[in-house]
From Swiss-Prot:
Stretch list, region Disordered: 1-982
Biased composition (Gly residues): 268-277, 473-482, 530-557, 656-665, 788-797, 867-876
Compartments, as annotated in UniProt: Secreted, Extracellular space, Extracellular matrix
Record carries keyword Secreted: yes
Family: Belongs to the fibrillar collagen family.
Biased composition (Low complexity): 122-170, 200-209, 216-237, 251-261, 333-352, 358-385, 435-448, 460-472, 507-517, 633-646, 666-691, 702-729, 757-775, 798-820, 854-866, 877-892, 916-935
Domain Fibrillar collagen NC1: 1071-1100
Biased segments, Basic and acidic residues type: 568-579, 893-907
Protein name: Collagen alpha-2(I) chain
Pro residues compositional bias, start-end: 239-249
Coiled-coil annotated residue ranges, if any: none
Pfam families for this protein: COLFI (PF01410), Collagen (PF01391)
Length: 1100
């Protein structure tokens, strides 16, 4: 029936489905005429116009400012040699030329007259080393070289025997949570145990399942009301009963207090666009708006048509650039050679040179025949080191050894003092040309040269294959708010309106970029020579030229003043060997030399059977020194040492003879590009090319060699988008562009990060009341928590898929000059020069490579005297693995290993002893009145009551569930019932006093807790400060936020012990147990047992 009460408003309904897209509206009315546009971008350079007629030669112009160096012209044909002119004044030094080709050998000139003594010239470059002198006497032993670089790790030796079991380490920190293991299979049923002794009577069993309803009995007589019994001891709380069915719907509750604002929801997915609305009526024309900001630069205009040929020039052009320098004239006739000057007086002896580097290693001897392997000896203790013996006399110089490998770089030596300048020796005869030495090692890295000029633009490389997509980077932090975004995609194209009135003519655009260079016109007549321009900047230093031919000797200058002391001279060549001296007296016995390097490993003998380990013998006597082993192979070349410090400037050497003038060098590199010429006349517009397919973006190629400057290439394909640059400053606002055609709708973007929490919303309408829930347990009141701070921004969603490449954009304005390109690859070798004169003898070449064939074995030499101890040899090759050593001491305890895989299910543990009875729990809240229980046993028959009217037989009700026991307070005394005889019912009377029993049990439990504390708040297992009585103090680790309850080391729980460790907390604030790690240590013995019973607790 209708009760007249208004139903609560459920609020607005859900959003409907999105409608289909409507048809396009009719075209709008034409807009008002726009303002005159800003001048457009400069147009593309027009095509080259036809060649104009040749103008008359102009008068000579004023001398212009110094122009940039022009490109060198092509070399002209070689002219006939002119007569030798008079000697001119010395000109200003010219720019250094490129390295010329080697000239032909000139004829010997006439001998010149001896000149006066010239000034002493600067010291010349170091001359080539002369031929090797005779071997000098053996120098003093140099200091031991630095330790070599660490050798490569040897092969792993065989595994050693297992060490003794180490002592148990301290427990490690809890590890991270392992993955949840799979449920193990059910274990097999264990064997039956032996019959235990009879246990104490157990507590009452749980209520059995409800039996089927009995047949309805006859209605019994109403019994008299019994006397109130004594309140029973509160039973232990029962297990939670099964979940009851839903109760009837309760009355509507009163509106609750307004809750705190919830956390902000995640940002919803962007809804689909609604249907397009119908077009509105045309509004009246508004007043003209203010002048808009300057629009973005429009696209470059199309190429203009070819303009008409220009008029013939009215006045002659300005003076042309000076021509390139003429070719060098032919070489003059060489002069006659001057006489040698007189030898100077002998200078004082120079300082003693540094000790020479160690000589190369001697030849490796032939390997001896392998000896048979002896039985393995016992390892003796090392004997004490003997004293060093005195060095014996030096032996005769051995033959020159084969070249060793490049040694490790030595430490940087101190700068030597400057030596006194030596006298100039007589010029020796020119030696034969030495054979070319092998390639030298790479020199140390030179200082960074000056930055090269900008390279010419290389030709466009082919598109490379597309690169792989990179892995997603880590989520970046929230960026600052960006500047206003770029202009959005153009909207749908409107229907064209009628053409507006013609606008005013725009300002002329800026001059277009210069067109390609026109064909070369006919050569004009030469202008009058201009005045000399100012001296140009000195050019960059050219590469050093090759050595020229030896010119005739100059006139000797006057003797110069003494130069500063020169750098310390190189070690002189050894003198001739002197005659053998008289034999010296025998010296006293020298100290033993240091141990020689290890000898070569002998061939492996037959493997003997392994004998049993014998006892360690006493230390043996030190054996006699073995013969010096062969020098091991040199180690691998070391890394290049650091460049040494600059030495002091040497004295200026004498000026060397002038070289012959070389032939003119190849054309120099192209000079910097000149300034743009005037724009050429526009050429005819070419046909529009077909649109090419977009190529895939290529991988970055290696930088190519600098190509010649090509003609301007066509507009390149759009490259892949570059990395986002920093936000630019806001440009001036452009005029509004025409609406473009509608772009395809993009894919739906990923859900953005949740925004910051919004403002507090208005209270919502009260919802309909839900059905009344089941009554929960009475929880303890929680403390009111602080309001949480808004969560941080979520991680940035993955980037959307890359859209298709757009059409090729208009050609952009020319960019700024790029950074100088990388140094190009080395050019091809020049033409081979003509053979030069025989040069002076070269320095001794680097050691040659090892020959293929071994030479014949020489005759055995006399045994030499014992040499001095040589420097320590290079590290020998890795020897074979040594004999197995004795077991080492136990290593330190390793770090905690990774959690192992889940083990198999263990055997069923022994049954634990019965636990102690718990303390009586606090009184629970009053339970709901239970439904009527089953009929109890018939009570004693009461006196007959008055007869009531007979009722109808009812059906027996179903069995109700037992209610939880409430704390029953005694009611007021009822009226006295009728008396009856209780004899014969003594067996039904309680034989115990329950209150006394409960007190005794409580005391017993407290005594047990004193003896075996279980770790609760009232019975803590161990207090770190027992004198503090205001709380429960445990050992905590605040770094890992752990609560550590350490066991007392003396009371480890055994399987037969009674160990029940529980830990009660004051407040139950969670429903799950976040155990991060559980690592029982020292388990697995036959008498050890481990169990864990976790209740609903929460700690961190």
């Amino acid at each position: 029936q209708y009760d007249g009460v208004k139903a609560p408003d459920p609020g607005p309904g859900p959003m409907g489905m999105m409608g289909a897209r409507g048809p396009p509206g009719p075209p709008g009315p034409p807009g008002a005429q726009g303002h005159t546009g800003h001048p457009g971008e400069p147009g593309e350079p027009g095509q080259t116009g036809p060649l104009g007629p040749r103008g008359p030669p102009g008068p000579p112009g004023k001398s212009g400012e110094d122009g940039n160096n022009g490109r060198p012209g092509k070399p002209g044909d070689r002219g006939a040699p002119g007569p030798q002119g008079a000697r001119g004044f010395p000109g200003t030094p010219g720019l250094p030329g490129m390295k010329g080709h080697r000239g032909y050998t000139g004829l010997d000139g006439r001998k010149g007259e001896p000149g006066g003594a010239g000034a002493k010239g600067e010291p010349g470059a170091h001359g080539a080393a002369g031929s090797p002198g005779l071997a000098g006497s053996r120098g003093r032993a140099g200091p031991a070289g630095p330790a070599g670089a660490r050798g490569a790790d040897g092969n792993a030796g065989p595994a050693g025997p297992a060490g003794p079991l180490g002592a148990a380490g301290p427990p490690g920190f809890p590890g991270g949570p392992g993955p949840k293991g799979e449920l193990g299979p059910a274990g097999a049923t264990g064997p039956s145990g032996a019959q235990g002794s009879r246990g104490e009577p157990g507590p009452n069993g749980a209520v059995g399942p409800v039996g089927p309803p009995g047949n309805p009995g006859n209605n019994g007589l109403n019994g008299a009301k019994g006397a109130a019994g004594t309140p029973g001891v509160a039973g232990a709380p029962g297990f939670p009963g099964p979940r009851g069915g839903p109760g009837p719907q309760g009355p509507q509750g009163a509106a609750g207090q307004r809750g705190l604002a919830g956390d902000p929801g995640t940002q919803g997915v962007k809804g689909d666009g609604g249907p397009k609305g119908e077009p509105g009526n045309s509004g009246p024309q508004g007043p003209p708006g203010p002048q808009g900001e300057e629009g973005k630069r429009g696209p470059t205009g199309e190429l203009g048509a070819t303009g008409p040929a220009g008029n013939r020039g009215a006045r002659p052009g300005s003076r042309g650039m000076p021509g390139s320098e003429g070719r060098t004239g032919p070489l003059g006739m060489p002069g006659a050679r001057g006489a040698s000057g007189a030898a100077g007086p002998r200078g004082p002896p120079g300082d003693a040179g540094r000790a020479g580097e160690s000589g190369p290693a001697g030849l490796r001897g032939l390997p001896g025949s392998p000896g048979s392997s002896g039985p393995p000896g016992k390892e003796g203790a090392a004997g004490p080191a003997g004293q060093d013996g005195r060095g014996g006399p030096p032996g005769p110089t051995g033959p020159r050894g084969q070249p060793g490998n490049l040694g490790f770089p030595g430490p940087k030596g101190p700068s030597g003092e400057a030596g006194k300048p030596g006298d100039k020796g007589a010029t020796g005869p020119t030696g034969l040309r030495g054979a070319p030495g092998p390639d030298g090692n790479n020199g140390a890295t030179g200082a960074t040269g000056p930055a090269g000029g900008p390279g010419e633009k290389g030709e466009q490389g082919a598109s490379g294959a597309p690169g792989f997509q990179g892995l997603p980077g880590p989520a970046g932090g929230a960026g600052e708010a960006g500047k206003p975004g770029d202009r959005g995609l153009p909207g749908d194209q409107g229907v064209s309106g009628p053409a507006g009135a013609k606008g005013e003519r725009g300002n002329p655009g800026a001059a277009g970029a210069s067109g390609p260079q026109g064909p070369l016109g006919p050569r004009g007549p030469a202008g009058a020579p201009g005045t000399d321009g100012g001296k140009g900047e000195p050019g960059a230093a050219g590469a050093a030229g090759g050595p020229g031919h030896q010119g005739p000797g100059g006139m000797p200058g006057e003797r110069g003043a003494a130069g500063p002391p020169g750098g310390k001279g190189e070690k002189g060549e050894g003198g001739h060997r002197g005659p053998d001296g008289n034999a010296g007296r025998d010296g006293s016995r020298g100290m033993p030399g240091p141990a020689g390097p290890p000898g070569p490993t002998g061939a492996n003998g037959d493997k003997g059977e392994s004998g049993a380990f014998g006892p360690a013998g006493p230390a043996g006597v030190r054996g006699a020194s073995g013969e010096r082993g062969e020098v091991g192979p040199a180690g691998a070349p070391g890394f290049a040492g650091p460049p040494g410090a600059d030495g002091q400037t040497g004295a200026r050497g004498e000026r060397g003879p002038s070289g012959g003038k070389g032939e003119s060098g190849p054309s120099g590199p192209a000079g910097p590009a000149g300034q743009s010429g005037p724009p050429g006349a526009s050429g005819p517009a070419g046909p529009t090319g077909a649109r090419g397919d977009n190529g895939p973006p290529g991988l970055t190629g290696f930088p190519g060699a600098a190509g010649r400057v090509g003609a301007a290439g066509p507009a390149g394909l759009v490259g892949p988008p570059g990395a986002a640059g920093p936000a630019g400053k806001d440009g001036p606002r452009g005029l509004r562009g025409d609406p473009g055609p509608s772009g395809p709708s993009g894919d739906q973007g990923m859900v953005g990060p949740p925004g910051p929490s919004g403002e507090k919303g208005x209270p919502g309408t009260p919802g309909t009341s839900g059905p009344l829930g089941l009554q929960g347990f009475v929880g303890l009141p929680g403390a009111r928590g602080d309001r949480g701070s808004p969560g941080g921004a979520g991680a940035v969603g993955e980037a959307g898929r890359v859209g298709p490449a757009g059409p090729a954009g208009a050609r952009g304005a020319p960019g700024n000059l790029g950074l100088p390109g990388m140094t190009g690859p080395q050019g091809e070798a020049g033409r081979e020069g003509n053979p030069g004169n025989d040069g002076p003898p070269g320095r001794p070449g680097a050691p040659g490579f090892k020959g293929d064939r071994a030479g014949p074995t020489g005759a055995a030499g006399r045994p030499g005297n014992r040499g001095e101890s040589g420097p320590g040899g290079a590290a020998g090759a890795v020897g074979p693995a040594g004999a197995r050593g004795a077991a080492g001491p136990s290593g330190p305890r390793g770090e905690k290993g990774v959690a192992g895989e889940k083990g198999e299910r263990g055997m069923k543990g022994l049954r634990g002893h019965a636990g102690l009875q718990g303390m009586p729990g606090p009184s629970g809240p009053s339970g709901d009145t239970g439904s009527a229980g089953p009929n109890g046993p018939a009570g004693p028959r009461g006196p007959a009551g008055p007869h009531g009217p007979p009722g109808k037989d009812g059906r027996a009700g179903g069995h109700g569930t037992l209610g939880s026991p409430g704390a029953r307070l005694p009611g007021p005394p009822g009226p006295a019932g009728g008396g009856y005889d209780v004899s014969g019912y003594d067996e039904y009377r309680a034989a115990k006093d329950y209150e006394v029993d409960a007190t005794i049990k409580s005391l017993n439990t407290q005594l047990e807790n004193l003896l075996t504390p279980e770790g609760s708040r009232k019975n803590p297992a161990r207090l770190s400060h027992p004198e503090w009585s205001s709380g429960f103090y445990v050992f905590c680790d605040f770094n890992t936020r752990e609560t550590c309850l350490h066991a007392h080391p003396g009371s480890l729980a055994r399987a037969e012990g009674n160990s029940r460790f529980t830990f009660s907390v004051l407040e139950d604030g969670c429903t799950r147990l976040p155990l991060l790690d559980l690592a029982p240590l020292d388990l697995g013995g036959a008498d050890q047992e481990f169990g864990l019973d976790l209740g609903p607790v929460c700690f961190k």
